[in-house]
Each structure stands twice: as C-alpha cells, then as structure tokens.
Amino acid sequence: MYFNNELSGLKDRFLKSLLAQKYPDRINFFLWELKFLDCFLHLQNFAFASECGMLDVSQKMLKNFKRMCATFRSIRPNAGSDNAFAYLKEVICKRLCATLLNTRPDACSDDGFAYWNEVIWKTKQEFRAKYSFPKTPLASNKVDDDDINIHSPKFVMEFIDAVVGNLNVLVKINDPCSLLFVPGPKEQIDQVSKELKLLRFFVCFVSNKCIEPQYGHTTFYIHALIEASHIAMVVWLHLPVYGNGNQDLAPSEVSRLLSDFISRNSNYIDVLKALKSTIPQAQNKHAAESGIVETPTHNLMVGLSDQMVNLQEMLCLLRDNLIHLPILDLEFHLQDMDSVILDAGLLIYSLYDIEGEKEDTVLDDMNRALGFDLPRNIEPIKVMVYLVMQKAFQCNLPRVHGLGYVDFLLKNLNDFQGRYSDSLAFLKNQLQVIQTEFESLQPFLKVVIEEPHNKLKTLNEDCATQIIRKAYEVEYVVDACINKVAPHWCLERWLLDIIEEITCIKAKIQEKNTVEDTMKTVITHTSSQLARTPRMNEEIVGFKDVIENLRNRLLNGTKGQDVISIHGMPGLGKTTLANRLYSDRSVVSHFDICAQCCVSQVYSYKELLLALLCDAVGDDSARRKHNENKLADKLRKTLLSRRYLILVDDVWDNSAWDDLRGCFPDANNRSRIILTTRHHEVAKYASVHSDPLHLRMFDEDESWKLLEKKVFGEKRCSSLLLKDVGLRIAKMCGQLPLSIVLVAGILSEMEKEVECWEQVANNLGTHIHNDSRAIVNQSYHVLPCHLKSCFLYFGAFLEDEVIDISRLIRLWISESFIKSSEGRRLEDIAEGYLENLIGRNLVMVTQRADSDGKVKACRLHDVLLDFCKERAAEENFLLWINRDQISTKAVYSHKQHAHLAFTEMDNLVEWSASCSLVGSVLFKNPDSYLYSPAFSTSLILLNFKFLKVLDLEHQVVIDFIPTELFYLRYLSASIEQNSIPSSISNLWNLETLILKSTPVGRHNTLLLPSTIWDMVKLRHLHIPKFSPENEEALLENSARLYDLETISTPYFSSVEDAELILRKTPNLRKLICEVECLEYPPQYHVLNFPIRLEILKLYRSKAFKTIPFCISAPNLKYLKLSGFYLDSQYLSETVDHLKHLEVLKLCDLEFGDHREWKVSNGMFPQLKILKLEYLSLMKWIVADDAFPNLEQLVLHGCQDLMEIPSCFMDILSLKYIEVDMSNKSVVKSAKNIEETQVEDNQNTNFKLVIIKKMVLKFDIYQNHDKGRLETFKKLVPLPGVKSVRFDMDEKKVTVTGVMDANEVQLVVSKLRKRGML
C-alpha cells in the first residue's frame, strides 16, 4: 500500500529467481504477510490509533524484527532504527529478502520462510486472545497535528483499497494445496469485501460533494478508517499460515463484522442529511454517485417485497447508467440528481433504524416509522432513473453513422414482433407508429445520398443523423424489453419520447422542403452537368531525374550488394517511386529474383519472411508451420546464389532492418535492395555503398502537372483563368504530392469553373502549407455524410495492409453503411461508394480485375490511415484497443457503441464485460493463428450482446459458434470442429458466414446442418469443403435462400447433391466447389446452374477426373476448371451453354483425344481472357472465327504444347500475350504473333511478355520415402531453381525455375548422383 513499489519490485525479483521454481506458493504467502503488516504498522504511526483503542502490533513486531536480525547475521539494520514500520520497510523487505534471494534453492533456503512464518504465527496467537473491536474517538477530541494526513479522504480510500485487495486474494485462491487457500465460507468474505467497497464509495461521494470538509466529515472518515482496519485485523488474525494448518475465518466473526457495519448506519444518515444543504460540485465522472446507490440484497428488508424490488431495480439502473456519464449531459439536472441520490441513500439506511423488523411489516407502518411516504419518495427516483438511463445511452452513440441503419431496423422490427410477440405486446402500438414514421422518412434519406451538394446539405445531414440516432434508441428499447433489463414504465415512456422527437424532425424537414422549393439550385455538379473524372492508371508524375538516378544505381555501380535507401517526409511518394522502379521492365530483367515486403510500424517478422519467400520461390502453405529461424535460413539459401532485387518498404527503426538484413547474403553479384523510410537515421544505418537519397519536394511545374493529371485525366486544362487558380492551389499544397492529390480529389467533384476553384483556394488558406493533415481534414469535411462512415472505417485496418474489396464491401453492408435503393444490389451501391472515395484520391487502388477493371484490392496512405484512426476515435466511431494503450477500459462506458479493433486476445478478455452495446469487434494481428485454452473465446464474446460484426480474420480460433448473438450479421473466424451446430439458425440476422479450418482440421469435410437453410438473410457462405448433413431434410423441409449470392466451398459427391443445393439457391452469383462423382451417367448430363450465376470455379477431388455434367449457365462470365480430365467434345458441348463467358481459366487439366483441343468457328464469342496453366495439351487447333473478342492470352507451364495457333495473329482485339515455362516453339510462335500484330495490324497496344522459366517433372511412383523427398527439396539453392512442388496424389515432383540448358543439366546430374533417376 504505502510502499507498493518496493513490494512489487520484490515480487518481480522473487519470481525471476531460482526460488520461484521451488517455492512459488511460499513466496506469495510471504509477500501477503508483508502487505498486511504494511497496512497495520503504517496506520499505527499516527496518534489516533491509540485513542481509538486499536490493538498495537508495532511494539510486538519490533521485538520480532530485532530478534530476526540477530538470527540472520547477514541482516544489518541502520543504526538507531527503533520503529516497527521502518524495520519492516528497511530490514524485512530489503535485507531479509536479499538474503533469501542470494541463497541457492538446493540449500536450506526454506529456513528463512519457515522462521518468518513461525514468528508471525505466534504473534497472531497472542493477539487473537486480546483483540476486540476498537471504539470510535469522541467527536470533541482534538485532532493531532501529526495525524492531519490520515483524515484526508484520499488516505482513507487508499487504505480501504489495500484491505479489499488483500481480501480478494482469499476469494480467488481455489487450490486446496495453496497456503492461502480458505476452505471456509468464501461467500461471507466476499460480502465483507463488497461492504468495504460501498464504504469507499461513500467516502468518495462525501469528498466530491464538499471541497472543504466540515469537522463532522472528518469524524466520518476516521470512523471509516477504523472499520476498515477492524476488518483487516480480524481477517489477518485468522489467515492460514504455513506449517499450522488452514485456519479459516470463523462464521461468527463474519457475522459480527456485518453487524458492526449495520449498527453504525446512523453515521451514514447524519452525513447524508448534512450533505442535503450543500451545493453540488460538477464532476467529470459519476463513479461515486453510482457507488452510493449500490444496494446489496441484505440491505433491503424482507417485508414490503414489491416496493423493495421496485426500489432495488431502479437503484441498480441508476448505478449502472451513471458510471462515466459525461457531466455535460446532465449539467442542467445536477441538483436534482444529487437530491435524488441523497434521498435514496437516506431511504436505504433509514430502513435499518426501524426496530422489530418483521416479514409482515406493512406499508403504512413503514411510512410512519420513516416519517415520509415511500411511494411518493420513489417517484423522483423513477424520473431520474429514466433521465440518466436515456442520457447514458445517447451520449455514447457514435457521431458518424451509416444511413443504411434504418433499413436494418425496419426489417428487424417485423422479425422481432413475430418472434417475441408476448414480450413486446405492451409496446405493440408504439412500435407500429414508429415503423410508419421511419418508413415515411426513407425518401428523405434517399435524397440526402443522391443530392449531397444541395444548398441545404448541412441541415439535411443533421436531420439524417438525428434519425439514425433514434433508430439506435428504438433497437435498444426493443432489446431491453425482450431481455427484461429495464422496467416497462421506463421503456414505454422512452418510445413515446422517440415518437415525439421523430415528429419534430419531420416538421423540420417539411419546413426545409418548403424553403427548398423556392430556391431549388445545386451549387456543384449534377449527373447531367459534370462528366466524371476519367479513370487513369497509376502512372507516376514528376521525379524524372530521381528515377533516372535510382535506375542507374540499381543497374550499375558496385559489384557487391548495395542498399538504395530513400527517405523523406510522409506524402512525398516514396512508396510510389520505389514500386515504379521495382516494376520497371528494364530493371526487373536484370535480376534473377525479385521480392518485396512492407514492414510498417508494427510488423510480424514471420509474415515478412513468408511474403519474401512467396515472391522468391512461390507460395507454399506448409511454410506457415515453420518457425522464424527456419524461414530466415530458407530465404538466405534461396538468395545466396542469385542476383536479387528486394524492396523493403516503410521501415520505421533500425531494429526492423536488423531483423531482415541477415537474410540478404552478399554474393558479390550486384544484388540490390531498395529501402524506404521516413527517417534519415534509418536510411543512413541501412546504407552500404550508396548514400541515402533524400526525396525532394515537387517543383512548381511538377505540382501543377500532377494536379492537372488527377483532375483532367489525359486531357489538358484549356482555360487559362482556371489554370491560374490551379497553379495557385498547387503552390498552396506546399509541393507535397499527397496534398496535391487530395486537393485534386476535391476539385474533381466540382464544376470546372473559376468561381468553384477560387472557393477551394480560399478554404485551404495559407495554413495548410506543408500540413497534409489540414488538407485531409478538408477532404473529409466535404465528403457527403454517407461516405464519411465508409472512409473512417478504413481506420480499422493495419498500416500498409492490402484490403480485399469483397471483404470490405461485405463489412460495409453489415455495418449498415450502405443505404438500399430499389432495383439495385447493395454490393453494386457499395462499389459506387468506393469508386467515389477513389475518385477523391482518398483510397489507392492496388489491384484491378483484368476482365472488367473493377477494383479488387486497395490500401490507404499512412497519413490518411492515421487521420481515420484519430478522427474515428474523436467521433466515438472506432476505438483501437492496443497492448500498450495507456488508457484503460475505465475511460469508456459500458454503453459504448463504437466499433472496437483489438490486437491481442487479452485485450478482448479485459474489455468484454465493459462493452455490452458495442456493435463491432474486429481483430487485427499480423500473426497467423491465436488460440488460448485458458479461456473460452466464445463465452467471452457473449458479453457483446449487440454485436453485428465479428471479424476475427481467421486468426482467432473459437471453441464454439456464439449462437446467442442474434444481431450478428457478419461472422468470420477459425474453428477446429468438423461440424456446425444446428443452433446456428438462431443467428437469424446473419448475412455473411466465413469459417476457416485450422491446420489441424483442414483436410476434413465439415458437416453443415440442415438448419443452415433456415437462415433466409444469408448472402455469403464461405466454409472450406462442407457438405449437407442431411440431404433428405434439406430437400423436404428447408426454404430457398433467395438472398444467397456466393458459396464456397461445397463438396459434391454426386450430381444430385449439386442439383439439390442449386435449387435452394436460385439467385446465386458466385460458386466455388469441389466435385467427386464415383458414378456418373454415360452421356453428359446438363446441369442447370442459377440464371444469375456469373462466377464458377470447379475443382476435382482426389478420387475423380472427369466432369460428369455439362455446365449450363446463360449469364456466366467467369469459369475456372482445375484438375479434371477433358476432351474437345466436352468443351464444345459446354460452350454452347456459355454464350456470355468472358474469362476462362483451365488449370492442371489432362486432355483426351490425343491431347488435342479443337476450337470451332463461333465458339467463345464474348471471351476476353484465356488462361491455360499446366495443361497436358500438345496440339491446339483454333478456327479463324473463334475468340473474336479475345484481349489476353496467358500460357503457364504448358510445356507439351507445340505452338500457339497462327489465327491469333488476326484477332484485332488482342492486347496481351504472356508465356511462362513453355518450350521454344511456343515462344517462337508468340513472337510471330507479336510481329504481325504490331507491324502488319498496327496494334500499338499489343504487349508480349515472355518469362524465361523451365519446368522439370519427375515421376516418383517408387521409392518416394521422406528422405528422397528431402533430396528434391535440396534442389532449391541450385542456380535457376525457383521452387519444387510435390503432388503425392499423382506421384509427381515439379521443379520450376529460370534455368538455361546448363542449369537443367546440373539439376539432372544432382538427382542421378542421389540415385533418384
């Protein structure tokens, strides 16, 4: 308590010492005794202790300490020390512990503990015989000057905290072998602890209300101190000690402790009456107020049960909702609240003064005894309870909302009233009125989105925000009613107030519309006035001299390894510049291996190694099982004999570079490393030969060119007046590329008029020079309200994280950020939102689909990400809970609605009880899997009862699916089980279900219960290798899932299985599945897929080769077939049913018909992309009129193919051919096609890419033991070898690499020497 730092330091030293291995329990017990003595001896330093008749332990302990010093010769107290507290601190806590710590565990080190315990035990025996409860000093006694500190409420509260902490350990120890184990009545000890906490709250409450305490308050503080010390003394005297058996606290002693508390309630009443005359002081928190209305069950009388139950219910609600309620939300009710709390306290403690308490006490007797009317006195409490409960909920709502929340509420209100009609019966009329009101407001919310530049934008958005806040309140009221967490009178009143407030909002909107009708203008673009900014590729603008300088360093210079360090402030374009060089064809062709990783401020060393290995030798899921040392060694050996180019982006400190530098060997072969960092020190530290490059700012010409390109695309600014303003704006951006790009995003959304641009220039002002955050803030300010939540949500992602767009959009929809629009899919609307953010240069595109150009992945610049995190926290929208976070959960209320992002499971455990109303839990950690058997993850999640999004990113393994969270709309996690419980249908709001198997259960088929088909709101189902548990039940009893759009990966064992699921999902758009059919019809069966299906990926299972059905999907655009046996007839019959196919990928296929594929005239009329990978195809015959719209042809690993058909020379739409790991004749035919396309057809957009790789395949039908497989793995370090892939089903080994003839010969000779060939 008073030297906690010393005790904590001792504990750490003990636990780190060898003694902890042998005597852990004795160490804890030893420290426990020291804590108690700390309390007693410090207290008895003050004169008031003897006046109160408190038992004096100091003299007795002083004699013991001195005797102990004589026994342990190594202990030497300071001269003249004659104080027990000083001895405890100096001699026992330092010198005795040092003696024990310096003793070897195998020596007789137990003597120190045993001797100490024996001395204390004998002392306790003497004290127990004499101890009695101390008396309270007379009020007339003068306070000793030396005791002035002991009367401060802070001292009293610290003392009580120390005693409570000591008591709590007794309750928590459940191991019977522990020296601190108490086998007796722990419930009574726990109750005493609660009583002490109440006393502390009372002390805190009194001190908060009185800045200058009166003498009566000082007496009360002393009274509280005596009671706490009495409890501590009784418990200490009966504490179990080593060697003397377990001595628990006697029940009679516990009863006396409680009776002592109750008999002194008159003191509480006197203080409360005195406080009635004080003026309440404004507090930042209401913790003391919430504590003062705490009402343990034994505080209320058995009689008058109905009245007492109502009172207790209201006081509990008041307590729960007062905690951390901001004072600003109750500043006008502060005096009323104080009065209610004081009256409640007087009411509770007055009950103890009624003599002859009996169960048959009646209300009139109670009122006469108390001197007031109990029902009438309860009424103000009721009013305050409602007010506090409402304010506590409202003040924690996020200030940025998704406009789709009303859609979600309206759907749920119908479901709730159907499922919980009995619970909601008394609210039925109010809920119907609310539904009608919200439905009438839907057109207004649609206008807010479709006309974001309306002159009344601010008023519109304010009204929209109020509407969404009312929707949150309705949801909470309905849930509180169903779960009975608030009284009916409170909820009914709340709904009536909501109806009244919605009426006021509608009146404001109506008034606004009347004004708007007379001034219907739009200050910026409309759809007919403004052409959207053209989409451009990420071509770099400026830095031409820098690029040439860096390119020269990469290709020339020293023969040894060199690190090219680029450093500069955020927003200069370091990453863009480095990526430009990394993807430069003239640079890439100079190196054997290219690999990259992004470090960031927080990183996982293992993930960095895996990323580099993936680029260097190809992806291999088995690598994740290896530890960091093995991965680092693998990377080093891979790079050892190659000339490599490594891009290490965003390094924050020297230690991160130290982690990686050992993996990059210097073979004196001109290998290069590009490193980007914000810090000059890091760049200088990493440099080897070349000096670090400090990236300069843009010059004025570059600044304008970048602004012009981002606003006008490939066109130029034709207006000189507009250009003058643009030049001024570019100059105001401080020559910082990021700032220029952000401002360009603002300008691109406006009319290209001088007046509009002048307005932007004026708003930017001069203060934004070199201040990118100011420009980000401006870009955020002009965002329409429906985009603000989408943008701030990026703050939930990690730094430099590449974000999958499909996942992002599903999260947005589940968070209700997307407002529905009749006739449009939510996913399409969300894509429009994303494109808007991209058009404003707030989001960077990292990958687009080849076929339609849609965004597949994106990321945020670090500056923008930091802004999102900070602004989201300010708006109570998103909170990051980090391991090193200074603030604790106590800062935030349990009424918190914000989305929470966690980085550690321990954080989730700690916060779970404090965030019952949180809507989203997002787990972010750079490591792979996290699973702790010490606690049940799913049980912890049940505390988040309003959870709508649970995204654990497949990193947290849950022990079971939390099926009680019926608000849940998005669930993503990993599981170890091989079946899903039928109770999953309780998640009736679930729209996205993503479950991933852990490495342990990855190869098992997961059984899906038939109840999954009752989840009619399901839109996306992603479970690895699942099959229906009961097909018959599925067919007969289940409904169709009309909303289900994507499924992966069902396991079809028969054509009938496939037909069954396809009939149940009529609106399916994407299907990824495995197929196994041991029996199939002799003639191809036509399988009719859903008419809306656009993407289909079919994989074969181990036991099957031929596809037993033709695919009929009239609107299919993307088809991938992998691992099957095919022939020309099958492809011809299938293509007849796929008239709209745009992308075809054929992978790992065996071709029949003499390994020949014939493509007839008119086949694949809409095909744009054709990818052929690892086919056994030898001869490819294509008619002249086939593939009329083909744009891309990619051949990977087609080593047996003789040539690309010459008809590809005449396909005018062809833009790109890529050849990888194919023979020379294929390369030659590709070059012939290039020559014809470019020279004869004048197709300047045509591009040919030839990747010079070689693939060697070896059969391992015999002698494929583990040792021989290891021999193949050892081929990787050889020159030119990139990867070795095993297919144990086919009993083949594939060796891939950039190998010439000599290198291939080296591989073969190595295998021959090992006896493998």
From Swiss-Prot:
It is found in: Cytoplasm; Membrane. It holds the Pfam family NB-ARC. LRR repeats lie at residues 944-968, 987-1015, 1090-1114, 1138-1161, 1164-1186, 1187-1211. Residues 419-442, 535-556 form a coiled coil. InterPro entries: Apaf_helical, Disease_R_plants, HMA_dom, LRR_dom_sf, NB-ARC, P-loop_NTPase, R1A-like_N, RX-like_CC. GO terms for molecular function: ADP binding; ATP binding; metal ion binding. This protein is encoded by the haplotype B genome of the allohexaploid Solanum demissum. This is Putative late blight resistance protein homolog R1B-14. It comes from Solanum demissum (Wild potato).
